Amino acid sequence: MPPPPRLLFLLVMLLVVAAPGAPVFGANAPPEVKAEIDALLMFRSGLRDPYAAMSGWNASSPSAPCSWRGVACAAGTGRVVELALPKLRLSGAISPALSSLVYLEKLSLRSNSLSGTIPASLSRISSLRAVYLQYNSLSGPIPQSFLANLTNLQTFDVSGNLLSGPVPVSFPPSLKYLDLSSNAFSGTIPANVSASATSLQFLNLSFNRLRGTVPASLGTLQDLHYLWLDGNLLEGTIPSALSNCSALLHLSLQGNALRGILPPAVAAIPSLQILSVSRNRLTGAIPAAAFGGVGNSSLRIVQVGGNAFSQVDVPVSLGKDLQVVDLRANKLAGPFPSWLAGAGGLTVLDLSGNAFTGEVPPAVGQLTALQELRLGGNAFTGTVPAEIGRCGALQVLDLEDNRFSGEVPAALGGLRRLREVYLGGNSFSGQIPASLGNLSWLEALSTPGNRLTGDLPSELFVLGNLTFLDLSDNKLAGEIPPSIGNLAALQSLNLSGNSFSGRIPSNIGNLLNLRVLDLSGQKNLSGNLPAELFGLPQLQYVSLAGNSFSGDVPEGFSSLWSLRHLNLSVNSFTGSMPATYGYLPSLQVLSASHNRICGELPVELANCSNLTVLDLRSNQLTGPIPGDFARLGELEELDLSHNQLSRKIPPEISNCSSLVTLKLDDNHLGGEIPASLSNLSKLQTLDLSSNNLTGSIPASLAQIPGMLSLNVSQNELSGEIPAMLGSRFGTPSVFASNPNLCGPPLENECSAYRQHRRRQRLQRLALLIGVVAATVLLLVLFCCCCVYSLLRWRRRFIEKRDGVKKRRRSPGRGSGSSGTSTDSVSQPKLIMFNSRITYADTVEATRQFDEENVLSRGRHGLVFKACYNDGTVLAILRLPSTSSDGAVVIEEGSFRKEAESLGKVKHRNLTVLRGYYAGPPPDVRLLVYDYMPNGNLATLLQEASHQDGHILNWPMRHLIALGVSRGLAFLHQSGVVHGDVKPQNILFDADFEPHLSDFGLEPMVVTAGAAAAAAAASTSATTTVGSLGYVAPDAAAAGQATREGDVYSFGIVLLELLTGRRPGMFAGEDEDIVKWVKRQLQRGAVAELLEPGLLELDPESSEWEEFLLGIKVGLLCTAPDPLDRPAMGDVVFMLEGCRVGPDIPSSADPTSQPSPA
């Protein structure tokens, strides 16, 4: 039965009356409302709105602006009273038009990216009660009268901006909350704050640049609850007048330069709960009132650390609410303050960094609520009381750097909540208690610098939450147990300075979160390093120094892209230094001294642009010092001493402008000391002794301002020691054992040296005269022989003419050979970096560049297969000589320079230039590369599609993507932009290792016309900056190749590799491979993305997750905005993270994978 009409009418009316909906004006909105709409739209027009939060602000809406997001209106009038748009990443400036919102009461734009100044016109909105502009990038000063004009303002928060200038001096009486913290305000704190802001309850001026003193007038703010002035430059004393702030709850003055005492009256404010005056220069005694008791029973937290307090006034009683007592880093002495044991509710006690002595009393066990006990950096002695085991709530125990002795208390194993234990720098002995294995929440265990003995207890290796383990500098022995691999959360492992022996267990490869590994100074660790060590992707610090490791210098470290510190010193490593270490972009310290490393210094180390220390002393290195080391602009220490290096010191080394230490002593270096070394303005130590250096000492070395140590002894230097160097380094041993060197501080007088030089010149002159005389004599003899021969020939001619018979010479006697000798004019040779091949050999190997030998046609010319008589197979790129538009190859000198530069770009995933040829004929330009027998990725994907894709399983696709990303990342790191990343330019060697090709060739052709002619026959159309379907829209529009464009092209290749869909399969402007992938993900049709060879992936398996991660990496790389695309180094990191299981080796042949039945 339906309700009666009257009841329905009443219900409708009730709803209408009760609904507080916004007024509906439509086109009949009053002028003042239209003005507010215009002001809001003008405000919106000046902002960038990435979340489109204001997209619904439509002036034609009947309920505008009251229905707009972030806008609230007064009921009935429709006037805007609130504008709240927090946390929306809005950027731009705040429009002064907001001053038209005359009824605005609340303005909240906090946590955005707003910039510019605070509009002064906002001060005309007298109705404003609250302004929230914190956590933006606003700058400039606050106008002095700004706050005073806002007569109804109660809350003003602009913390976390870039505001500067002085703090305003006048405030409205209504102001209760003022937060100007974390800006750049300067000047002093206005003394008249209390005169105008009489109702102030919260005042935060922390983390600015305020100077001067704390105004005593702040003591008149009777309603003040919070006073925070931390992190400024305040001086003077703490005014006792602050004790008049009877409502004060929290006083924080940390991180200033306040002096004098802590006034007892301030500590005794009855309402005070938190007292923080740490990191100042306060002296005297800590007043008893600071610990609660009769004077102040409300105190909960007392922080007075980092001052110069020398004593503590012991309170008669302790506050019942006392929870935190921080007395660290003062000058307190005497025994442990046992009276603190009466604070039963104490949770944090920090006495570290003082001069307390004696034993820790058993009474510490009464602090049953204690969570943190920090006693480090004192002089406590004796044993740790077993009663500490009663502190069942303890989470942090710090006893470092004291004089504790005895065994580590087994009672610690009963403190099940312990997270951090620091026992280093004491004299603990005995074994590590097995009971520590009960601490299932333990995250950090540190016991360095004690006298602990025995093996590592197996119970330690069940601590699944342990992230930090430091047992260094003890007397622990035995082997490192394989169970160490159970510590899956471990990030830092330091076992250095012990007596462990045996090998590093392979289970260390399970520590995938490990960042620091220090096993140095064991002496008895030996054998080869486990390969699993090189699979720890987050490893940043490795020190294996001072052991007995052997074998070749491990090349596996080159796979650890995050590695910053590598120390292999004092071992028995042999072989050469791996060139692949030059591919470690983050490497800062490389030390491999005191080994048996031989061979030449790899020039690739110059690619480590962040390297600060290179220490390879005391090895068997030979050859020259690479001039490319000049690119190491951050290098501070270079020590190559005690090797067998030869040739000259490269003058380019002076480009290492950060060098502090340069040691090249005890080598076979020759030539002169480069005068350019004087450009090393930061150099402090220079040791060139025990070499074969010649010439004079450059006087400019004296211009190095901070040089403290110099040694050029035991060379073959000559001439006079520069006077400034002689007086600066007055020890004769600095210049000793140079027979031809003279002048102070040596005893060799330069006058005697000059006489010796004069005798040498006379001897040389006499020798020269002798040589000239002998030459003249030989010339006279030669002329006489010629005259004699001429006269004899004339006589024979006359005799023959007169008919005189002569005996005929017997055939062959005295006659020359009748045959013509072949002129062995050498054939023109290709400039090969590692072999000798002539141009004629290459013409024969390519059958005179026959079409049948063409491997590919690219935008830079034709690639020929060259099969040489000795079985060598190479790929020859022949650059076009001319084109339809008249473009020609660059002249020979420039071509050679570009080719030499390109030949230095080496990476395992790039096609490396092996040689070049620059004529004759004059228009021939050839580039020589390794032959890639397994074709390119485009062909491989096409074959995969014809065989249901089974020849390309997921691990192989991942390895291809990872290899290409590494090669492209190395190109970008070397300053090279590829410009045409596509499957046709990804080649495979005999081991199916991917190599990125066709890069760095643009400078070798004057214009693009020559490339265009050859590219016309390419399988995919090519633009000036890439290939259609792969080129980034922004790069195509700009007509210029960029790193961001390369990332986009790589993303397209990655999506094609994973899905099997070519970009050319999508027709029309509204569809491409990126949009297609996104649409499948939005539909949840992930199976549609799978290439046929990946259809057997189990959705519950890790490989399924890895595949999805790879898809997401591809979408990140193809972001529409170039600024949103990751760098290739980040792409490598993400792709390395895609494989959570073991990878197949990169040499695996994908065609050997059988197709499933």
UniProtKB/Swiss-Prot annotation:
GO biological process: brassinosteroid mediated signaling pathway; post-embryonic plant organ development
Record's GO cellular component terms: plasma membrane
Residues annotated as glycosylated: 58, 149, 192, 204, 244, 296, 438, 465, 494, 524, 567, 607, 610, 655, 679, 692, 711
UniProt keyword annotation of Lipid biosynthesis present: no
InterPro entries xref list: Kinase-like_dom_sf, Leu-rich_rpt, Leu-rich_rpt_typical-subtyp, LRR_dom_sf, LRR_N_plant-typ, LRR_R13L4/SHOC2-like, Plant_LRR-RLKs, Prot_kinase_dom
Signal peptide: 1-21
PROSITE patterns listed in its UniProt record: LRR, PROTEIN_KINASE_DOM, PROTEIN_KINASE_ST
One Pfam family cited in the UniProt record for this chain: LRR_1
Keywords: ATP-binding, Brassinosteroid signaling pathway, Cell membrane, Glycoprotein, Leucine-rich repeat, Membrane, Nucleotide-binding, Receptor, Repeat, Signal, Transmembrane, Transmembrane helix
Residues the record lists as binding ATP: 855-863, 930-932, 936-939, 980-985, 998
Span of domain Protein kinase: 849-1144
Gene Ontology molecular functions: ATP binding; protein kinase activity
Membrane-topology descriptor: Single-pass type I membrane protein
Keyword Transmembrane helix attached: yes
Tissue distribution: Expressed in developing culm, coleoptile, primary root, young spikelet, young leaf blade and leaf sheath, floral meristem primordia, stamen primordia, and lemma and palea primordia.
Observed effect of gene inactivation: Dwarf plants with erect leaves. Reduced organ sizes due to decreased cell numbers resulting from reduced cell division rate.
Membrane spanning residue stretches: 765-785
Additional facts recorded: Xiao means small in Chinese.
Domain notes: The protein kinase domain is predicted to be catalytically inactive.
Function: Functions in the early stages of organ development by regulating cell division rate. Is probably involved in the regulation of a number of cell-cycle genes. May act as regulator of brassinosteroid (BR) signaling and cell-cycle controlling organ growth.
Similarity section: Belongs to the protein kinase superfamily. Ser/Thr protein kinase family.
Name of the protein in its database record: Probable inactive leucine-rich repeat receptor kinase XIAO
Source organism: Oryza sativa subsp. japonica
